[in-house]
Curated annotation (Swiss-Prot):
<feature type="binding site">
    <location>
        <begin position="10"/>
        <end position="17"/>
    </location>
    <ligand>
        <name>ATP</name>
    </ligand>
</feature>
<comment type="function">
    <text>Phosphorylation of dTMP to form dTDP in both de novo and salvage pathways of dTTP synthesis.</text>
</comment>
<keyword id="KW-0547">Nucleotide-binding</keyword>
<dbReference type="Pfam" id="PF02223">
    <property type="entry name" value="Thymidylate_kin"/>
</dbReference>
<keyword id="KW-0418">Kinase</keyword>
<dbReference type="InterPro" id="IPR027417">
    <property type="entry name" value="P-loop_NTPase"/>
</dbReference>
<keyword id="KW-0067">ATP-binding</keyword>
<comment type="similarity">
    <text>Belongs to the thymidylate kinase family.</text>
</comment>
<dbReference type="GO" id="GO:0004798">
    <property type="term" value="F:dTMP kinase activity"/>
</dbReference>
<dbReference type="GO" id="GO:0006235">
    <property type="term" value="P:dTTP biosynthetic process"/>
</dbReference>
<keyword id="KW-0545">Nucleotide biosynthesis</keyword>
<dbReference type="InterPro" id="IPR018094">
    <property type="entry name" value="Thymidylate_kinase"/>
</dbReference>
<dbReference type="GO" id="GO:0005524">
    <property type="term" value="F:ATP binding"/>
</dbReference>
<dbReference type="GO" id="GO:0006227">
    <property type="term" value="P:dUDP biosynthetic process"/>
</dbReference>
<dbReference type="InterPro" id="IPR039430">
    <property type="entry name" value="Thymidylate_kin-like_dom"/>
</dbReference>
<dbReference type="GO" id="GO:0005829">
    <property type="term" value="C:cytosol"/>
</dbReference>
<protein>
    <recommendedName>
        <fullName>Thymidylate kinase</fullName>
        <ecNumber>2.7.4.9</ecNumber>
    </recommendedName>
</protein>
């Protein structure tokens, strides 16, 4: 039996990452083998590319190609083998993030994105994507309060992040059966109740 592939998405400051390990723990309590990973990253090569992607200035197409190169390695080394063994993968960001950040935020031609997506992972898509959405001003306030060094995406202007958010919502509108939008501007307890309900209904 093929495993399940769940991804977490959302603008910077949406708080999605704090729920990734929680969901993995919940699934492990049910006896499911779960791999927690992230993009860019997830493999030794992917983590090296992550450092470049998050910190080095580069041409849009270079950035996009490196994202997909890291993803191909990630799929080949971790995601596809785990799913083939019947294990689950919970990933912090995947291809929807490239659609939102490079496509929406940076203005990459959508046709180029779709061609790369098809080439790199064919028909493989997450079984479920949890999109954490909240007003941009709330997200920016959370980032400021975190008081940490920001990567190059987090340092982008407000209009960039608004385009990213709208691209995410557009993607969710076109794939409503896969992408479930979570109101991230509510209590952690309520968010986790909603996550458990969605995963139980859609994947278990």
């Amino acid at each position: 039996m093929k495993g399940k592939f769940i991804t977490f998405e959302g603008i910077d400051g949406a708080g999605k990452s704090s729920h990734v390990e929680w969901l993995a723990g919940l699934l492990r309590q049910r006896g499911i083998v779960v791999h927690v990973t992230r993009e860019p990253g997830g493999t030794e090569l992917g983590e090296k590319l992550r450092e470049l992607l998050l910190n080095e200035p580069m041409h849009l197409e270079t950035e996009t190609l490196l994202m997909f190169a890291a993803r191909r390695e990630h799929l080949a080394r971790l995601i596809e083998p785990a799913l083939a063994r019947g294990e689950w993968v919970v990933c912090d960001r995947f291809s929807d993030a490239t659609y939102a950040y490079q496509g929406g935020g940076r203005g990459l031609d959508r046709a180029k994105f779709l061609a790369l997506e098809h080439w790199v992972h064919g028909h493989l898509q997450p079984d479920l994507t949890l999109l954490f959405d909240l007003p941009l001003d709330v997200a920016r306030e959370r980032i400021v309060l975190a008081n940490r060094v920001l990567d190059k995406f987090e340092q982008e202007r407000v209009d960039f992040h608004e385009r990213v958010r709208q691209a995410y919502l557009e993607r969710a509108h076109t794939s409503p059966s896969r992408i479930r939008v979570i109101d991230a501007n509510q209590s952690i307890e309520n968010i986790r109740k909603q996550l458990e309900q969605i995963v139980s209904t859609d994947c278990l």
